[in-house]
Regions:
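Glycine-centered loop-to-beta-strand initiation motif
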Residues: 29, 60-68, 106
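Bacterial Sec-dependent N-terminal signal peptides
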Residues: 1-30, 76
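Structural motif
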Residues: 28-39
């Protein structure tokens, strides 16, 4: 009985330790048109690899900024789409040691 309780306690401590190492990462950036004007309400999606399931998503602000809070570590593709412009796909590898990832300014190209 003592071994069972000790084993269960060890399992609980290990599980809690694993969960405490999962950090929330904030992904942010700015989206502009090729004229350098902000891409207002552009769609920003964070797709989890390998199956491209949407993990998070938002629309850009009036200034073209976006923030995706509470993202967990992993491999992703950041997809940015906006009517009249070509979609952009940016690979992201977010590590557990990271708390924030700024992808910078993304310039969208006009869809001819």
């Amino acid at each position: 009985m003592k071994k069972i309780i000790t084993g269960m306690a060890l399992l609980l401590v290990t599980t809690l330790s694993a969960f405490s190492q999962t950090k929330n990462i904030t992904v942010s950036g700015r989206v502009v048109e090729d004229t350098k004007e902000p891409a207002i309400q552009a769609t920003v999606q964070l797709l989890l690899l390998p199956d491209s399931v949407q993990a998070s998503g938002t629309a850009t602000t009036a200034q073209g900024y976006f923030t995706l809070p509470k993202v967990i570590a992993g491999k992703y593709v950041l997809k940015v789409s906006y009517i009249g412009f070509k979609s952009q796909y940016i690979p992201l590898h977010l590590y557990a040691t990271t708390t924030a990832k700024n992808v910078g300014t993304l310039t969208l190209e006009t869809d001819a």
